[in-house]
């Protein structure tokens, strides 16, 4: 395999590690997703309320794991 070739699993793992190092978190909230995507707050809230978006409820907050977020991004280009 050429060193420039990566499979999807490797790319997802690298992106999860990059975001984890940048934000110091394993879960993203609305504000984090706004920073990452550049979307507005209302659009991110709509996205987080979409049943197809991989959120988890912790207490009264909706969050998404970094891994699920990155996988979702790759599957929804």
Q: How should these model regions be labeled?
A:
Residues 1-46, 66-77:
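Basic Lys/Arg-rich amphipathic helical interaction modules
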Residues 56-63:
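Short Lys/Arg-enriched helix C-cap and helix-to-coil transition segments
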Residues 51-52, 76:
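The DNA-recognition helices of helix-turn-helix-type DNA-binding domains
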Residues 52, 65-66:
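Short secondary-structure boundary/hinge segments and terminal tails
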């Amino acid at each position: 395999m050429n060193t420039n070739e990566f499979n999807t699993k490797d790319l997802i793992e690298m992106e999860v590690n990059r975001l984890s190092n940048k934000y110091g978190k394993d879960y993203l909230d609305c504000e984090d997703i706004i920073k990452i995507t550049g979307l507005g707050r209302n659009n991110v809230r709509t996205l987080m309320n979409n049943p197809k978006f991989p959120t988890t409820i912790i207490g009264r907050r909706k969050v998404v794991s970094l891994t699920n977020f990155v996988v979702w991004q790759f599957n929804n280009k």
